[in-house]
Amino acid sequence: MSTPTRTVTLVDTTLRDGMSSVSHRFTPNDVAAIAAGLDRAGVRTIEVAHGIGLGASSIQYGFAAATDPEYVRAAVDAVDHADIAVLYVPGIATLAELRAAVEAGIRTVRVAVHCTEADCAQQPVEWAKDHGLTVMTFLMMSHKLDPEPLAEQAVKLESYGADVVYVVDSAGAMVPRHAGDRVAALRRAISAEIGFHAHNNLGVGIANALTAAENGATFIDGSLRGLGASAGNAQTEVLAAAFERAGWHTGVELFPLIDTAEQVVAPLMTEPQIVDETALVLGYAGVYSTFFHPTKRAAAKFGVPTRDILLELGRRGVIGGQEDMIVDVASELAGRTYDLPARAGI
């Protein structure tokens, strides 16, 4: 194999996005074991928190097994080299919760906003920079904007101080051309580093990540065993192997990654991470990945096929935070109304 001449940084989100695959039930001991394995493998940024991000442990998004600061401290204490990061979604997280995460030991924050709403990131990005954090920013549901308008949003994020701006395929709706075009547009528009976050609903998460790198992305997200919302993320250990085969230097060691995935993560999984019908249609319809489990529950409750609910949600252009629309659509498709207690039961 030839000596790699290009470099890409792998960021692992098993302990944040991957939380969605285990109903946010990783314990602090689980977090410590996984973080230690990632650190030994050379992963230098590890994202930790509730699956939706800081402050999301709730009846709306599901209760986690521990608090965000407990998770952060467990990870910080377990690593020797890696930075521990958290996800901050304006409207869910607060600056007080971010401050608590800083006190617990994070050195990186990832601020995530819908792809048309970069303005919402200004306050947390500026606060984080003032407090000495590395700031990565997410343009969620990036498939909903064409490349040039997406790049305009990236320019705003850079102006607030973002160190990295991510193209984020929150729905797993992109194919490689979509990923490449959007990253290339950002590369022309900003000087900040560019990242790419894939979901695997159409089975092309790894291909999308490789194409993103070819077009200028230098940070690539993954999760061990592909854990993550709906169909899951690009699989970290597969990314490491694929990038090495493609001639890229990642700085991580493949076999320690595989060992952590097989010996630590796999026994904690409650079900295989697969592209089932719901995950596939979710990506096809371009619906946010966190709609996965609520849509399945609504389909069972109202006796409506999940695909019909997701296709209608896609037609309505729903975004993250509009999960209440799932029940509205399921009820309409079922041709009956629902009362408030029934809705709360979803």
From Swiss-Prot:
Keywords: Aromatic hydrocarbons catabolism, Lyase, Manganese, Metal-binding. The keyword Metal-binding applies. Residues 8-258 form the Pyruvate carboxyltransferase domain. The keyword Lyase applies. It catalyses: (S)-4-hydroxy-2-oxopentanoate = acetaldehyde + pyruvate. It is an enzyme of class 4 (lyase). InterPro entries: 2-IPM_HCS-like (IPR050073), 4OH_2_O-val_aldolase (IPR017629), Aldolase_TIM (IPR013785), DmpG_comm (IPR012425), DRE_TIM_HOA (IPR035685), PYR_CT (IPR000891). Pfam families: DmpG_comm (PF07836), HMGL-like (PF00682). Mn(2+) binds at D17, H197, H199. This is 4-hydroxy-2-oxovalerate aldolase 2. Its EC number is 4.1.3.39. Belongs to the 4-hydroxy-2-oxovalerate aldolase family. GO terms for molecular function: 2-isopropylmalate synthase activity; 4-hydroxy-2-oxovalerate aldolase activity; manganese ion binding. One of its GO terms (biological process) is L-leucine biosynthetic process. Substrate binds at R16, D17, S170, H197, Y288. Signal peptide: none annotated.
